[in-house]
Regions:
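Transmembrane alpha-helix signature in integral membrane proteins
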Residues: 443-471, 516-523
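Periplasmic/extracellular loop-to-transmembrane helix junction in inner-membrane transport proteins
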Residues: 14, 18-25, 56-95, 99-133, ...
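Hydrophobic beta-strand positions that form the internal "hydrophobic ladder"
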Residues: 88, 136, 197-199, 252, ...
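Generic hydrophobic transmembrane alpha-helix motif, especially the helices
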Residues: 491-559
Length: 559
């Protein structure tokens, strides 16, 4: 009988060992497979992130898409493309306006004329708009000016989008009197805000004049009623080559050769000459000056190909325009076109070489020669992905790929001198409230902030963790330890990303609903622990005997 029992025990033990080995092998292969899959998943995540991030560092490209001619007359004063990249427009120095297709379909061909208009009057001057603006002003021989803009009406007949171009006069059909003496306007500049517009001009007899129109809403009709006032610009240079006006109507720039005069027009009753600067590069002459998007910086093009950026810097309690950085082009700057909503710009030399730059990144993104000679006009679309240029009678379209010009290694890891800052700095500001400011992408503050936060977290976490581990190992009872130890190990095994995800989605709303209590917890919890220890110390031995040795930690749970 004993022999039979022994045989049965051996058989049961062998069967149990066989099952155990099978389970061990399954567990071994399962853990190995799971670990390998985790590594594969991490590698896939890494390569996917690399695939997503890589285009940020791609360079700019431009590819020709179309070429056409238009029945135009006069010199091109302003060339542009509407927001949908479907219609282009050209304003001449004689007031002729042409609308044409820049995208073709079965009904419309690229370059097909979609409409024409004419600004009436004896035109003697024209003021193209600043980057991102759509208002253009024409000056007349009688000292008046007319402000017009291209308008694109969008309709959906039969569920098909149709864009109809036209010419509008947003401030009324009647011209504005810029010079009360009625002299011809030979050079002018124009800018407007929501409730004010200003026109500065040079008259035929060399005077500097300015007209400012203020708008007020009629509370009965709801229409905007405009009233104009005229002012004089003192100390105007004898030979004015160019004028610029900031969109906030605070600063007027007047260029005479290589010299730039800066006028403070914030107080129109006391227009004053604030500064006179020599802005040319060494051994070069200025060919063109433009405002960068946001109108906080000046771009100065020279005949040696150098383009310099200037903006105001606070020095000795005063704000002075300072040369910040230079860009080297390929030849004498003939065209200088800022982008609409970014700190980039495009230049073209007399040989037809087109170059893309980004001002803050201090980078030259692309340089490509366009066959056909010098460009007479150059425009970039509001989406920055279509380039329109004119060479003689020919108009050319290019598809531009330039998604992230602001992202460079220097912008990420080096000090950058941003507009409005007194010196180069490490700055992180991913978004901004308006186009006047730009994203600041330095990773240095993020890295140091992360390291600093980790250090201060470890200052508190390391002593608490080590002390908790010592207490759990040497003082806590075995019955309580078997619950605490696995719980802590599971928490340690959870990725911090998961913990952050739970904290953001689940814990944050709970804390928000009890925020005063959570803040008081930081004060009351240490006090409660000390008070509990004090009370426990003064309890008699008979009162302490109800709690077994090593279970004292549960007294803190109610707290």
């Amino acid at each position: 009988w004993r022999f039979c029992m022994s045989s049965e025990s051996i058989n049961l033990g062998m069967a149990g060992s066989r099952k155990r080995r099978i389970k061990d092998k399954l567990a071994k292969y399962g853990v190995t497979t799971g670990g390998a899959l985790v590594l594969v998943a991490l590698l896939l995540i890494f390569f996917y992130l690399l695939y997503v991030v890589k285009p940020i560092f791609n360079g700019a490209t431009m590819e020709p898409t179309a070429s056409f001619t238009l029945p135009v007359a006069g010199k091109t004063a302003w060339l542009g493309v509407e927001e949908q990249n479907e219609i282009g427009y050209r304003f001449s120095d004689k007031g002729q306006v042409n609308f044409f297709a820049v995208q073709g379909d079965g009904k419309v061909k690229v370059g097909q004329v979609l409409g024409q208009a004419q600004v009436k009057g004896d035109i003697t001057a024209v003021a193209p708009p600043a980057p991102g603006q759509k208002l253009i002003a024409y000056g007349f021989a009688d000292g008046k000016a007319q402000v017009v803009q291209p308008y694109f009406k969008v309709s959906y007949p039969n569920d098909v989008r149709v864009i109809e171009p036209s010419l509008q006069s947003p401030f009324g059909e009647a011209p504005v009197v810029v010079d009360p003496q009625g002299k011809a306007l030979t050079l002018m500049v124009f800018e407007a805000t929501k409730d004010k517009m200003a026109t500065a001009a040079v008259t035929a007899d060399g005077r500097g004049v300015m007209a400012v129109m203020s708008g007020e809403e009629n509370f009965l009709s709801g229409d905007i009623e405009w009233s104009a006032q005229n002012y004089s610009i003192p100390s105007l240079p004898r030979h004015v080559d160019q004028m610029l006006l900031t969109p906030n109507l605070r600063i007027l720039f007047v260029r005479e050769g290589n010299r730039l005069s800066v006028y403070d027009i914030h107080n129109l009753n006391d227009i004053s000459l604030r500064d006179v600067m020599e802005i040319n590069a060494p051994n070069a002459n200025v060919t063109r000056v433009e405002l960068l998007s946001g109108a906080s910086s000046l771009l100065v093009g020279n005949d040696n190909g150098v383009i310099s950026q200037w903006f105001e810097v606070a020095r000795d309690g005063k704000r002075q325009f300072t040369q910040i950085r230079d860009f080297k082009g390929d030849g004498a700057v003939a065209q200088l076109t800022p982008e609409h909503f970014r700190k980039g710009f495009i230049s073209a030399d007399k040989e037809g070489t087109v170059s893309f730059f980004h001002a803050t990144g201090e980078t030259k993104l692309l340089s490509e020669k366009v066959e056909g000679g010098a460009l007479s006009a150059l425009a970039i679309s509001p989406r920055h992905n279509v380039l329109l240029m004119q060479q003689g009678d020919a108009f050319k379209l290019f598809a531009v790929e330039n998604e992230h010009p602001e992202v460079t290694w220097s912008a990420l890891w080096q000090q950058v001198w941003y507009e409005g800052y007194p010196e180069p700095q490490y700055v992180w500001q991913s978004t901004s409230a308006s186009n006047d400011f730009e994203a600041k992408l330095s990773l240095v503050p993020l890295v140091f902030g992360t390291l600093k936060a980790s250090f201060y977290a470890m200052v508190f976490a390391v002593p608490l963790g080590v002390a908790g581990a010592i207490y759990t190992a040497y003082f806590m009872s075995a019955g309580l330890r078997k619950y605490v130890k696995p719980t802590v190990e599971i928490m340690a095994a959870l990725p911090t990303v998961i913990l952050g995800f739970l904290a953001g989605l689940w814990l944050a709303p709970i804390i928000e609903g009890a925020l005063p209590g959570v803040v008081l917890l930081l004060i009351l919890l240490p006090m409660g622990m000390l008070l509990t220890a004090l009370i426990w110390n003064y309890l008699p031995e008979r009162g302490k005997s109800w709690l077994p040795e090593g279970w004292h930690a549960i007294l803190l749970i109610p707290g």
